[in-house]
From Swiss-Prot:
InterPro entries: NADH_Q_OxRdtase_suD, NADH_UbQ_OxRdtase_49kDa_CS, NDH1_su_D/H, NiFe-Hase_large. GO terms for molecular function: NAD binding; NADH:ubiquinone reductase (non-electrogenic) activity; quinone binding. This is NADH-quinone oxidoreductase subunit D. The gene is nuoD. The lineage of its organism: Bacteria, Pseudomonadati, Pseudomonadota, Betaproteobacteria, Burkholderiales. NDH-1 shuttles electrons from NADH, via FMN and iron-sulfur (Fe-S) centers, to quinones in the respiratory chain. The immediate electron acceptor for the enzyme in this species is believed to be ubiquinone. Couples the redox reaction to proton translocation (for every two electrons transferred, four hydrogen ions are translocated across the cytoplasmic membrane), and thus conserves the redox energy in a proton gradient. PANTHER family: NADH DEHYDROGENASE [UBIQUINONE] IRON-SULFUR PROTEIN 2, MITOCHONDRIAL, NADH-UBIQUINONE OXIDOREDUCTASE 49 KDA SUBUNIT. It is an enzyme of class 7 (translocase). It is a peripheral membrane protein. The keyword Lyase does not apply. NDH-1 is composed of 14 different subunits. Subunits NuoB, C, D, E, F, and G constitute the peripheral sector of the complex. It catalyses: a quinone + NADH + 5 H(+)(in) = a quinol + NAD(+) + 4 H(+)(out). SUPFAM superfamilies: HydB/Nqo4-like (SSF56762). Belongs to the complex I 49 kDa subunit family.
Length: 417
């Protein structure tokens, strides 16, 4: 009798549900996955090596391009590692601004995740709603840094500039009449903080909308409940972090367990799952959006009451003000030196980790006393999660592989880096 062989199937890298350039080699028995072999490296851009050839400040924009859905949180880990080596303290106002933008970025990431995950499973409406909300948050990025995605807003010693007093407004054009224009600019009359405050006042209702569409939806539950189950012990052994670990019932969040910046002064909860399946991870991330809303609200309240510097007053690290640079020779020299040679970081090594929307994002930095890193190692959460795909998908149907890739929330910028 002829030997029955497993069927081998290539999934991606052009597949719409592959979230970028994932190539999976699936070994199938009928429609059941026996083995899932991820092939990575199709988006490798040598970020770690490039950083060794650039000054410390020139590598900040590279960080935006790692996980290109959670831009500012990547920068945060990098500048924190530099600050550890320099031994400098960031002004409190800058810390609050950083925390606020970390949470804005978390919401941006989770909106992209819920939209793409729902679209993969077959619910298109959520995708459209999520992108409606993302648009406002992209405008917040643009107002503060000039770029909708790659902000390069965090700097060693603080942030690039203070929050603007006016929110940019839509201008008149041929495609909008006066009535539509005034409606679009309705919540843009005040400062950037007013705009963010208005958005996060409306946002909980938007999250309720997504939950109405998905949480008790029969098809959604059939596709997610009991799929990709990971036990708490196994999740720890596999190096899972973030929502992947919390979905398995382990309460681990760097913002609470190893607080950085001003997270220890803020009031928020850590959502934790019970069953460790795709559905629990979905519920954890949805609740994270609500908790981020709470954190942003507290930051706005503090920032309104406490004006102050947003950059350290140390011209060896931070550039002088634009006005000072144009009117004072000494400050011009400092400015020129900072942006040509850069600052020298004392010899040593440091590891800084932040609670990234996808898990623990870490930067391990070694300095030999020069103006460039000797070695930069990036600990990407998605890399560890993707390596668990084989174990999570084994014994499931092909259609469930799409759900499992979606629940891992993978972006290949950081996996391949």
């Amino acid at each position: 009798m002829a030997e029955i062989k497993n069927y081998t199937l290539n999934f991606g890298p052009q597949h719409p549900a592959a979230h970028g350039v994932l190539r999976l080699v699936l070994e199938l028995d009928g429609e059941v996955i026996q083995r899932a072999d991820p092939h990575i490296g199709l988006l490798h851009r040598a970020t770690e090596k490039l950083a060794e050839t650039k000054t410390f400040i020139q590598s900040v924009p590279y960080m935006d391009r790692l996980d290109y859905v959670s831009m500012m949180v990547n920068e945060h880990g990098y500048v924190m590692a530099i600050e550890k080596l320099l031994g400098i303290e960031v002004p409190v106002r800058a810390q609050y601004i950083r925390v606020m933008f970390d949470e804005v970025t978390r919401v941006l990431n989770h909106l992209m995740w819920i939209g793409a995950h729902a679209l993969d499973v077959g619910a298109m409406a959520v995708f459209l709603y999520a992108f409606r909300e993302r648009e406002d948050l992209m405008d917040v990025y643009e107002a503060v840094s000039g770029a909708r995605m790659h902000a390069a807003y965090y700097r060693p010693g603080g942030v690039y500039r203070d929050l603007p007093d006016a929110m940019p407004q839509y201008k008149a054009s041929k495609i909008r009449n006066a009535k539509a224009l005034s409606k679009m600019n309705e919540n843009r009359q005040g400062s950037l903080l007013d705009f963010i405050d208005d958005f996060f006042t409306r946002f909980p209702k938007c999250v309720d909308e997504y939950e109405t569409l998905l949480t008790d939806n029969r098809i959604w539950k059939q596709r997610l409940v009991g799929i990709g189950v990971v036990s708490p012990e196994r999740a720890l052994n596999l190096g899972m972090t973030g929502a992947m670990l919390r979905g398995s019932g382990i309460e681990w969040d760097l913002r609470k367990k190893q607080p950085y910046e001003v997270y220890d002064k803020l009031d928020f909860d850590i959502p934790v799952g019970v069953n460790g399946d795709c559905y629990d991870r979905y519920l954890v991330r949805v609740e994270e959006m609500r908790q981020s809303t709470r954190i942003v609200k507290q930051c706005i309240e503090w920032l309104r009451k406490n004006p102050g510097p947003v950059m350290i007053d140390n011209h060896k690290v931070a550039p002088p003000s634009r006005v000072g640079m144009k009117s004072n020779m000494e400050e011009l020299i400092h400015h020129f030196k900072l942006f040509t040679e850069g600052f020298h970081v004392p010899e040593g090594e440091a590891y800084a980790a932040v609670e990234h929307p996808k898990g623990e994002f870490g930067i391990y930095l070694i300095s030999d006393g020069a103006n460039k890193p000797y070695r930069l190692k990036i600990r990407a959460p998605g890399y560890a999660h993707l390596s668990t795909l084989d174990e999570m998908a084994r014994g499931h149907m092909i259609a469930d592989a799409v759900t499992i890739i979606g629940t891992q929330d993978i972006v290949f910028g950081e996996v391949d880096r």
